[in-house]
């Protein structure tokens, strides 16, 4: 009898923990309204990172936009043009090779290249700030070609 009672309780627990389907109309209501900019800055940043792409990568000692970066930046421009109400900061980064001064200047050139590219696609220049961190904030530690490639980037950060 005790086994039946435990099975009955477990079954009731499973049934009661099932998700309800609502009205059954089939119309899903989004929990975050990314398209109109009504979500928090953190939610927008997560959306940018996961759904659009928040990083453009560069070749060694280069600041020009390559095909892979252009693909990401075109998606960013489309999203930014359809999502008003906030600014972005473009953070330029470099790998560990080179002097601090050289890498700060290269990171700034990279951030400015991304800004010019986004503006050419219709993003309001007044929404964009640039900053260089040079080699001071690596995304990947180590002195390997993979780590260096990961660190040669511009990251788009959502502002207010």
Residue ranges and their predicted role:
Residues 1-2, 19:
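N-terminal hydrophobic targeting signals that begin at the initiator methionine
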Residues 2-8:
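Sec-dependent signal peptide recognition
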Residues 14-17:
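C-terminal motif of bacterial Sec signal peptides marking the signal peptidase cleavage site
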Residues 19-87:
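Periplasmic peptidoglycan-binding/tethering modules of Gram-negative envelope proteins
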């Amino acid at each position: 009898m005790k086994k039946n009672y435990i099975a009955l309780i477990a079954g009731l627990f499973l049934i009661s923990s099932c998700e309800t389907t609502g009205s059954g109309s089939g119309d899903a209501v989004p929990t975050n309204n990314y398209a109109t900019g009504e979500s928090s800055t953190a939610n927008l940043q997560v959306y940018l990172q996961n759904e659009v792409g928040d990083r453009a990568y560069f070749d060694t000692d280069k600041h020009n936009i390559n095909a892979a970066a252009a693909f990401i930046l075109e998606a960013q421009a489309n999203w930014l043009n359809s999502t008003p109400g906030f600014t972005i900061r473009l953070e330029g980064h470099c790998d560990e090779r080179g002097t601090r001064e050289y890498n700060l200047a290269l990171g700034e050139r990279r951030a400015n290249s991304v800004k010019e590219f986004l503006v050419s696609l219709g993003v309001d220049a007044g929404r964009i700030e640039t900053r260089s961190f040079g080699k001071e904030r690596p995304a990947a530690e180590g002195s390997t070609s993979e780590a260096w490639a990961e660190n040669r980037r511009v990251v788009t950060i959502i502002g207010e």
